[in-house]
Amino acid sequence: MKDLLNLLKNQGQIEEFDAIRIGLASPEMIRSWSFGEVKKPETINYRTFKPERDGLFCAKIFGPVKDYECLCGKYKRLKHRGVICEKCGVEVALAKVRRERMGHIELASPVAHIWFLKSLPSRIGLLLDMTLRDIERVLYFESYVVIDPGMTTLEKGQLLNDEQYFEALEEFGDDFDARMGAEAVHELLNAIDLEHEIGRLREEIPQTNSETKIKKLSKRLKLMEAFQGSGNKPEWMVLTVLPVLPPDLRPLVPLDGGRFATSDLNDLYRRVINRNNRLKRLLDLAAPDIIVRNEKRMLQEAVDALLDNGRRGRAITGSNKRPLKSLADMIKGKQGRFRQNLLGKRVDYSGRSVITVGPTLRLHQCGLPKKMALELFKPFIFGKLEGRGMATTIKAAKKMVERELPEVWDVLAEVIREHPVLLNRAPTLHRLGIQAFEPVLIEGKAIQLHPLVCAAYNADFDGDQMAVHVPLTLEAQLEARALMMSTNNILSPANGEPIIVPSQDVVMGLYYMTREAINAKGEGMAFADLQEVDRAYRSGQASLHARVKVRINEKVKGEDGQLTANTRIVDTTVGRALLFQVVPAGLPFDVVNQSMKKKAISKLINHCYRVVGLKDTVIFADQLMYTGFAYSTISGVSIGVNDFVIPDEKARIINAATDEVKEIESQYASGLVTQGEKYNKVIDLWSKANDEVSKAMMANLSKEKVVDREGKEVDQESFNSMYMMADSGARGSAAQIRQLAGMRGLMAKPDGSIIETPITANFREGLNVLQYFISTHGARKGLADTALKTANSGYLTRRLVDVAQDLVVTEIDCGTEHGLLMSPHIEGGDVVEPLGERVLGRVIARDVFKPGSDEVIVPAGTLIDEKWVDFLEVMSVDEVVVRSPITCETRHGICAMCYGRDLARGHRVNIGEAVGVIAAQSIGEPGTQLTMRTFHIGGAASRTSAADNVQVKNGGTIRLHNLKHVVRADGALVAVSRSGELAVADDFGRERERYKLPYGAVISVKEGDKVDPGAIVAKWDPHTHPIVTEVDGTVAFVGMEEGITVKRQTDELTGLTNIEVMDPKDRPAAGKDIRPAVKLIDAAGKDLLLPGTDVPAQYFLPANALVNLTDGAKVSIGDVVARIPQETSKTRDITGGLPRVADLFEARRPKEPSILAEISGTISFGKETKGKRRLVITPNDGSDPYEELIPKWRHLNVFEGEQVNRGEVISDGPSNPHDILRLLGVSSLAKYIVNEIQDVYRLQGVKINDKHIETILRQMLRKVEVSESGDSSFIKGDQVELTQVLEENEQLGTEDKFPAKYERVLLGITKASLSTESFISAASFQETTRVLTEAAVTGKRDFLRGLKENVVVGRLIPAGTGLAYHSERKRQRDLGKPQRVSASEAEAALTEALNSSGN
């Protein structure tokens, strides 16, 4: 019987749908949902606990309180199903219907819906073309609005206050109709003729000239068209009927002691009903107008509070002074419906416990406490016990399990066998935060975790907890095993390098066993094979570090993948020979014949994975770990105070530095240097001293003297414990050792500036009170930073995931020929990232030719793997065009060729891979390692001494790139441009290093000169910024009036004077607009001209510039006319770390961005206006010149008569990404953003593949702005999805009509997420109210294309294994079948997907 009942209960129909539409509900619709009108504010009878009739919980409207039982008890039992009791009027049904049935309230006076009124831009306001303020005055009964002017002089929509209204009444009588309140607004909305208005607006827009007006009109037009297209009627934005939520969704729960806990909604509904009933009564009584108005206003406020409390005026509070939670609050925010219940649910079959180390586990195992396993696998155990006949019923089985009988444990062991469980550590920052393991039953209460997966989880064993989840269905177990098993996740999806890498003890052990020692026991022995070495070591004949000869048999994998055996005798050490025993066949002996540091081990595992494949690598990783643990135990490495050896030179270096500082102080005292220069120099000095001390210390620590076999004393690498730990990469770094045994160095003040006096002591010597006090600041700041960082980093990840969540690989090849040009990333003198690393795992977009010929060496469409990278290196290829997510032409999603290699698997990416989410996680996960600080120039205490020259590292040929220069009298070049660069090319013509040359640098070589390694080729003063003359002549001062524009500074210590230009802000009124300058004149007093132009040579001086010349002095080409101290020249804060990454992804415009040339042409300066300069660029083709006003304080890099190209920098500053996109195009923007973000991560030593950043950038470039509408339906200035424009243009192309023209637009990630096609996704991200309001008005459809939408509606996501389900549905939809994918069909599709991904 019970089963029958359950059957009846579960008869809910599963709705089939492809899209979700949101719209406005008409009053008729609300009434059709309703099961009756709620007339009374009562809830339940407090004595009988029965719902009051016609009240908010009325059983007649909403259904019975108990299953199949009417309220008065006349009808009970199933047989009366569907009967309506004539006594109490309740239908006999399931109590569950109280969750579904809605009621309604008939409002006595219409009420405006607050969302469409107050959510900006106000939709009601836009439609009526009235301001929000005016509409509110009408709604809240302060003014009348004219609805129908009739034959009078009034206008429709005009506001009248009481006086004006009565005057009009006297004048016109009943000829016009003016009202107030929501009725008036309702009438006005009702009277709108959409078609007529749309036609009028479309005519009006082309005839308008003002930009703002066009914007306003097109906004209105868009809204009107949205209403017309969606079938919503404008008057529905004013409610006449209010729906009432089903009572079980706003429950009233009796607590003990006769009190009740109630949902806030009930209070809000009660207020509405009370006020509505009172208004009805007042209207029946024909009460005075002023009372009715007040009541109507109160009703409006009550409905406002119910829909969105606190949106207008003060929030209504309950009995406990807390604002009541309205309907809008239910859905928005972290605790709202979307983020709390739809996107994140709590799950059953899970447990959590503390983790401990499991050094004996295999990589695919985890130790699960028996207690936990018993609880987690209960149902399985019950089933097994019953199936075996050990227990007769489930109840009996339950008893057995509770008693923990011995047979239960046997069954448990069987159930658990090969049933993977998922382990998750919060915070789950990337997909490796959840992995699958096979459980091994253990005693105790802590979960055991394999040490090698700690890096992926970012786990340590200081009390971390982890959660266990059980995949129940067969499919879930299959996915856990095939995709999530820890052994299948060896490589990190962020950069394609192994993430299963030994650390700490294991590294220490492997390093220790592969080090060599001079004259160790057994040195010089020779062994026939590895077994002999093992015996010699075990019997104590040979030490672990002894140099010996060994004959080894290695099997090496050739190019063809075949193993070839090879026997040779090698020089090695005992430890390395022992280590080779665990190396899999296929790797040569050379991989272990070195001291194994952390980097080398990582490289070894990576190499192993590429050569011998996954299975052997996993076994090898385990063996490495066991070996490492064993030998680090044997080594007995530990730290004692005597390990910190302080170098003898320390005192000498510090004394020398102190003397030099004194020297600088005396220079300052005699006025040779300014305060700022002194500060800089002192800090540079101490930085240098610190470096020297640490060099001396490391040199001291890293070598020790020993006696070799001949009895001579020789140096060998030290076995100092501390040095070994740092050198191997197990723990600690040179910087930390420096603080322990060198000197602590410079410290920063709370505001980030550096304290001039460093801490000269180290921790071994101990700090005195002052030094300790200075140190405390940094330590505290570190802790405060970490807390901030975590939150910010998490928020960045959330925004990234949101913007990229619907990017999935949907096809193999989009067929595009575009791509990005990749060249090695050179910075300063170093190749930071060689070409090989940048193109690895990418697909070539255009054929690569052999340098200097037209022979194709790599055809387009090749996926570049490690072999191809080596080949490109050999052929010395300089640049390659590769396919990129940014240039991919797939409409929805992205194609596998443009993405290239799946970094975590090492082959081409599968269809269905959620590359967007992976990109977001890869960028967000290291976020917590980035710093939060903004550095001032000269900020970080770890700052290196400022560069003041270019010293080349490699020999080669000099190349100068876009360098403008003048030649000094002595033949040296002086740079007079800011974008100049100097590069050194090797004999093949490949660039090996590249340096930026600042303005004023003195360059001692010419283009094409040969230089030797180590030569200094350029010099400059790092602390001041010079202004250099380009002609010979005599100095004449212009506009330099003492006390008005300049002040003569006499250094009080020295009596020397120089002239300093005052900041315009500090000048008296007379000097505000004067621009002091130094101009050059010839002997006759005529202006000299800049070479090659007709522009006079005069140099305008920015604020704070220092002039050391006197009026009338002689200067020659390349001399310095004035200096701008670098400290005072606007200290631009370098935003570092996380905030910088966020700024780039949000595409924020910097405060004072660099100014770029809008067009190519010749520079000239027009008439000046107040405080601004007029820059004119005249194009060379004779078209219209371009003018721009630039503030006077901006330092311009261009002079009159200079040629510039479009997009060249005119005035320095941080770049504005929007300008780069507009003037230089998508690929320049991609290059800029990728490099900027990579710089931040690289500084912290984090590797992220470029394509993740490009993937996010693709999402930021989704929208375009229509510049000409052509014959399309778009309006000029619209922001539309690129795909929409392309589709419509294709359509127009087939009909021979004019396509729309457009410009790409860059949106920040928050904005891009909110402007996605899917309103469900946008609403669950941020600004829920605004998104839903907009979607409802336009009647939006959500086609459930992304991942988030599908999670919200509870479907499989269209990615990974779920893609098969979705494409099967789509196929059936196209065939016109009903959309029910049967289990077998889905399974077939799934197996196919899994098989294809396995290959």
UniProtKB/Swiss-Prot annotation:
Signal peptide: none
Cofactor dependence: Mg(2+); Zn(2+)
Binding locations of Mg(2+): 460, 462, 464
Descriptive protein name: DNA-directed RNA polymerase subunit beta'
Amino acids binding Zn(2+) 1: 70, 72, 85, 88
SMART domains given in the database record: RPOLA_N (SM00663)
GO molecular function: DNA binding; DNA-directed RNA polymerase activity; magnesium ion binding; zinc ion binding
Organism expressing this protein natively: Pseudomonas paraeruginosa (strain DSM 24068 / PA7)
CDD domains (UniProt xref): RNAP_beta'_C, RNAP_beta'_N
Region feature Disordered, mapped onto this chain: 1367-1399
Keywords per UniProt: DNA-directed RNA polymerase, Magnesium, Metal-binding, Nucleotidyltransferase, Transcription, Transferase, Zinc
Membership in a protein family: Belongs to the RNA polymerase beta' chain family.
Cofactor note: Binds 1 Mg(2+) ion per subunit.
Any one of the GO CC terms: DNA-directed RNA polymerase complex
